[in-house]
Structures are given as structure tokens and as C-alpha cells.
Amino acid sequence: SDRELHRSKAAYFF
């Protein structure tokens, strides 16, 4: 889902 993808991207930043 888009929301899950957003969390995945955040994980890359952290």
C-alpha cells in the first residue's frame, strides 16, 4: 500500500 511504502522510505532515511 502507499502508506506502507511511505514508512519504508522513512526507514531508509533512518
From Swiss-Prot:
GO terms for cellular component: extracellular region. Its main location: secreted. It is found in: Secreted, Cell wall. Keywords: Cell wall, Secreted. It comes from the Eukaryota. This is 31 kDa cell wall protein. It comes from Arabidopsis thaliana.
